């Protein structure tokens, strides 16, 4: 019984020693970030590695913004702040399905407008020319005329620069449907013509 008491006393004493080293390690780590009052917005550039798609590792290099209310959103180059909180539910579901379509390089024909029957084939053709897509993110939609919106998608492509695609969607009754999509480099070529 005495050995158990002595062992427990030693463990309690050791916990104070180790807790101090954990506190100092945490303080050293978090001292690299700038903390703000909720009234202000602060930009902090960070880089880290994360595991994506089972065994592959992807380098992430982005800016993080802290907003009032304690929310933190990443800022992705070419896309702006990635904040999906104010996107209507039906549109967010459509964008998530488009994200899956980009990853699979194939789109469900039901996501396209009925009048534009060529879109699934054109989508498969264009996406088939790309190497493996590692990750896809989408930005806040931009309102166009009438029932049209544009949403920018960024595709991280294996062993290449990322690709930005502008997707135009139209509202049909309560559902969002794909109207067209343009790679950013396509838009640059159209501007020259």
Swiss-Prot record:
Residues 1-26 form the signal peptide. Keywords: Signal. This is Uncharacterized protein TP_0690.
């Amino acid at each position: 019984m005495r050995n158990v008491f002595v062992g427990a006393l030693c463990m309690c004493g050791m916990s104070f020693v180790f807790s101090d080293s954990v506190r100092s390690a945490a303080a050293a780590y978090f001292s690299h970030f700038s903390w703000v009052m909720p009234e202000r917005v602060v930009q902090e550039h960070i880089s880290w590695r994360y595991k994506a798609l089972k065994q592959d590792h992807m380098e992430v290099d982005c800016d993080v913004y802290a907003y009032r209310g304690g929310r933190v959103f990443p800022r992705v180059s070419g896309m702006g702040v990635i904040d999906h909180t104010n996107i209507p539910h039906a549109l967010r579901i459509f964008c998530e399905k488009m994200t899956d379509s980009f990853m699979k390089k194939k789109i469900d024909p039901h996501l396209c407008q009925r009048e534009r029957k060529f879109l699934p084939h054109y989508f498969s053709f264009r996406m088939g020319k790309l190497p493996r897509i590692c990750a896809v993110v989408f930005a806040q939609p931009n309102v166009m005329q009438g029932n049209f919106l544009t949403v920018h998608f960024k595709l991280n492509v294996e062993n290449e620069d990322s690709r930005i695609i502008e997707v135009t969607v139209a509202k049909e009754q309560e559902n969002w449907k794909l109207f067209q999509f343009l790679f950013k480099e396509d838009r640059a070529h159209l501007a020259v013509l």
